[in-house]
C-alpha cells in the first residue's frame, strides 16, 4: 500500500509512505510551485498529476486549509483547488485532513507547533524530515 500526504502551498511538502508486508519505507520532499496566479495553478495541477501517475498511491491525503494568515489564503486556495481538480479529473480520490486533526493525531492536541509535531513524529516512528 502507498499513502501520499500533501501539504499544499507555494512550497508544497509531500511524503510517500510505502507499506509492504510488515515493512515500510518513506520518501519526502518539497516541490516549489513556480510562477504566479494562473500560471502557478496550471503548474501545480500538472506536477501533482505527474507525481501521482508515476508513484500510484492507493490513498492520497491533502491537508485542509489553515485560516491563520489571511494574506496567503488566496494562494493556498488556488494551489489546493488545482490539486483537487487534477485528482478529480484523473479519477483519483483523496481525503481532506484538517490541520488540527493531523496535529491531534501526532501530538495529542490540535494546536501543536510544527517543531513539536516533527519531534513527536521522530519519537513515535523514528522518522525525521
Regions found by a protein language model. Give the residues of each.
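Phosphate- and other anionic-substrate recognition elements at nucleic-acid/protein interfaces
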Residues: 1-129
Amino acid at each position: 500500500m502507498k499513502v501520499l500526504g500533501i501539504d499544499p502551498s507555494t512550497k508544497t511538502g509531500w511524503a510517500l509512505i510505502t507499506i509492504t508486508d510488515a515493512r515500510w519505507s518513506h520518501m519526502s520532499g518539497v516541490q516549489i510551485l513556480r510562477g504566479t496566479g494562473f500560471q502557478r495553478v496550471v503548474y501545480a495541477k500538472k506536477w501533482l498529476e505527474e507525481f501521482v501517475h508515476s508513484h500510484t498511491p492507493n490513498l492520497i491525503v491533502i491537508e485542509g486549509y489553515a485560516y491563520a494568515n489571511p494574506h496567503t489564503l488566496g494562494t493556498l486556495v488556488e494551489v489546493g483547488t488545482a490539486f483537487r481538480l487534477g485528482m478529480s479529473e484523473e479519477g483519483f480520490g483523496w481525503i481532506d485532513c484538517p490541520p488540527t486533526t493531523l496535529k491531534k493525531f501526532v501530538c495529542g492536541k490540535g494546536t501543536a507547533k510544527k517543531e513539536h509535531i516533527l519531534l513527536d513524529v521522530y519519537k513515535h516512528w523514528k522518522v525525521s524530515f
